Amino acid sequence: MTEPGMDSDTIYQEALSRVHQVLERARATDLPEPTAGILATVGRDGWPAARTVLLKQLDEQGAVFYTNRASRKGQQLADNPRAALCLHFQPLYEQVEIRGVVAAVSASEADRYWAQRERLSQLGAWASHQSEPLASRHELEARLEEVESRFPERVPRPPHWSGYRIIPVSIELWSAGDGRLHQRERYEHRTDGWSHFLLNP
C-alpha cells in the first residue's frame, strides 16, 4: 500500500532512486555489463520476442536504449509501443523490471548519444541491416569496408538509428530470500497516480 502522506511524484521519485541504487551496487561488482537487460516486445502477430539491450539513461522521463529502428524490435515497437525491460543482477541476487509505453527519443538526444559512440560502432550501424537474412559474413564485411571508405572522417547518424524511451507504468524490484520467500515490491501508475505495494513471492 502507498505510504501515508506520500504524494504520487514522491513515490515515483523513490522508485527511480531505488533503481539507481541497485545499478550503483551492480557497477561495483564484476558484472561485465551492469546495465544490460532483457527487452521484451510483442509484434502485430502476437508473438513475443526478447533480446539484450543496454540501459543508457534513466530519469523522470523514463528508461532509454538505442537501436536500429528497422530491426525486429523497432518494427514490433512501431506496431505495439509497449515493452518490458528486465535487468537481473546475479551477484546481488536482485532484479528490476520496468514496464511501460515506448516513445522515440528526440533527434537531438539521439545525435548526442551517437557522437559518444566509438567509430567502429558507428560504422557498424551503417553496415548492418539488422534482423535481415545474411548470405555470408563476407557480405557484412564488404559493406563495412564500403562505409569506411564512404565516411573517412566523421560518421553521421543513420536515419534508421535512434533511441527509444520506456515511459514507466510499473517498476518492480525483486531480491532473493531464503526458502524462495523473496522480497517483491511494485511501484505502479494508476488513474490516481503512483502507488507502492508488496507482492507475494
Curated annotation (Swiss-Prot):
It is an enzyme of class 1 (oxidoreductase). Its cofactor is FMN. GO terms for molecular function: FMN binding; pyridoxamine phosphate oxidase activity. NCBIfam families: pdxH, PRK05679.1. It catalyses: pyridoxamine 5'-phosphate + O2 + H2O = pyridoxal 5'-phosphate + H2O2 + NH4(+); pyridoxine 5'-phosphate + O2 = pyridoxal 5'-phosphate + H2O2. Pfam families: PNP_phzG_C, PNPOx_N. This is Pyridoxine/pyridoxamine 5'-phosphate oxidase. Binds 1 FMN per subunit. Pathway: Cofactor metabolism; pyridoxal 5'-phosphate salvage; pyridoxal 5'-phosphate from pyridoxamine 5'-phosphate: step 1/1; Cofactor metabolism; pyridoxal 5'-phosphate salvage; pyridoxal 5'-phosphate from pyridoxine 5'-phosphate: step 1/1.
